[in-house]
């Protein structure tokens, strides 16, 4: 009965909201024109209704995976010597039953020298060569948004940072300073169920994780750099990071509470034309500084990571891409020896394969896409089918899914099986 009532409410929500969107749309267009004509402020954004439902019964979470109204506003003003950018979302979330504001950008950009660009404030940071796989990219992610069916834009979470880019004849250099650790939005049970190793079962809202996040300015800072060089079309890069694991990869057994151990990353990448497409390689060493000996079972070991990928156009308006990803745990014998009894053991090598297929139809207004992860070592995977149709320059409709599968409940993707969901959205862009 509860499920039927929820389906009825979601259906009503999906039918009634589109009727009110045209009135909202007209008002947003008028506001956009006013801001530019009177204040020379460029305004963009969208108004979106997005709704989704779990396809499996999950006793630990609500049946609705997503049910929200989102208004994004992107404002920018050029003051000749500096540009001000503000991007924020107003969100009415019927799953969490909250109204929230999400500030995604609030920064100043300027160029004090011909060879220097500076951006200070809240911003989205990203680098590396992977397609939804990350080795060099050590910046915050929002895994909850990714798994419940929000736009892929929301996988990248903002950082409060200062970024300086220097452009030399021989190479380019990016320096990033984050005065206080930001961290990723991880699966804690409040929205998505997960494998709880302490309970030895799937848990959710009945046992939400709690963490202790480093939050002292200056003391709990993050530092990152990237050095890039283009040699006749071949893109080379070296990366460095000094900070913390972006998700809580440790536990304080005395409290107990999840913690963010200290981490350094040293990585490199190459991207070049290959076999009529684009190929890329990425290597990384994750130095888990709080457990360099590898004998502390409460902190994730150091590891090597490797990523190789290739993408190309298979036919007109049809592209494909494949990737291979590897995690190799260092000091595996020590990890096995000190692992507490009853805790499921990780593999020394974790392999992941990905496939992306994208087809454009109807004058490229209809996009059919399919992205899947599969781990042969974990025997689990995750599929992301999506259909996006651009009705006109203003209106877009989208349907998609997040499909998890796996042989065991304790593997990375396998633990999310009960979170499998389908969603639909209607968006007006202004």
Can you name each region flagged by the protein language model?
Residues 45-53, 86-90, 120-122, 175-179, ...:
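Transmembrane beta-barrel strands of outer-membrane/channel proteins
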């Amino acid at each position: 009965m509860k499920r039927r009532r929820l389906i009825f409410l979601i259906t009503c929500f999906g039918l009634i909201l589109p009727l009110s969107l045209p009135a909202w749309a007209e008002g947003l267009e008028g506001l956009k024109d006013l801001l530019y004509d009177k204040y020379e402020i460029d305004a963009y954004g969208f108004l979106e209704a997005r709704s989704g439902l779990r396809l499996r019964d999950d006793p630990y979470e609500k049946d609705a995976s997503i049910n929200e109204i989102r208004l994004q506003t992107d404002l920018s003003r050029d003051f000749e010597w500096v540009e001000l950018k503000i991007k924020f979302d107003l969100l009415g979330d019927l799953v969490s039953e909250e109204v929230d504001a999400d500030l995604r950008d609030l920064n100043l950009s300027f160029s004090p020298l011909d060879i220097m660009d500076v951006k200070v404030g809240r911003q989205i940071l990203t680098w590396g060569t992977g397609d939804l796989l990350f080795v060099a990219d050590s910046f915050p992610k929002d895994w909850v948004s990714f798994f419940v069916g929000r736009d892929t834009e929301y996988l990248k979470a903002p950082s409060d940072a200062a970024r300086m880019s220097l452009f030399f004849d021989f190479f380019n250099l990016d320096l990033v300073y984050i005065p206080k650790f930001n961290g990723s939005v991880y699966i804690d049970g409040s929205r998505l169920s997960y494998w709880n190793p302490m309970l030895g079962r799937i848990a959710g809202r009945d046992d939400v994780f709690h963490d202790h996040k480093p939050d002292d300015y200056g003391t709990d800072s993050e530092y990152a750099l990237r050095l890039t060089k283009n040699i006749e079309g071949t893109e080379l890069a070296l990366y460095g990071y000094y900070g913390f694991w972006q998700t809580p990869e440790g536990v304080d057994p005395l409290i107990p509470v999840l913690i963010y151990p200290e981490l350094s990353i040293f990585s490199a990448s190459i991207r070049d034309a290959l076999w009529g497409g684009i190929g890329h390689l990425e290597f990384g060493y994750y130095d888990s500084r709080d457990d360099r000996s590898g004998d502390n079972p409460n902190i994730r070991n150091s590891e090597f990571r490797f990523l190789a990928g290739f993408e190309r156009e298979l036919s007109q308006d049809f592209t494909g891409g494949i990737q291979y990803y590897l995690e190799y745990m260092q000091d595996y014998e020590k990890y096995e020896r000190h692992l507490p009894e009853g805790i499921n053991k990780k593999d020394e090598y974790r392999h992941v394969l990905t496939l992306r297929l994208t087809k454009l139809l109807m004058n490229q207004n209809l996009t059919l896409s399919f992205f899947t992860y599969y781990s042969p070592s974990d025997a689990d995977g995750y599929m992301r089918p999506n259909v996006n149709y651009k009705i006109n320059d203003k209106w877009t409709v989208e349907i998609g899914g997040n499909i998890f599968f796996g042989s065991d409940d304790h593997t990375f993707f396998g633990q999310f099986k009960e979170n499998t969901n389908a969603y639909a959205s209607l968006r007006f862009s202004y």
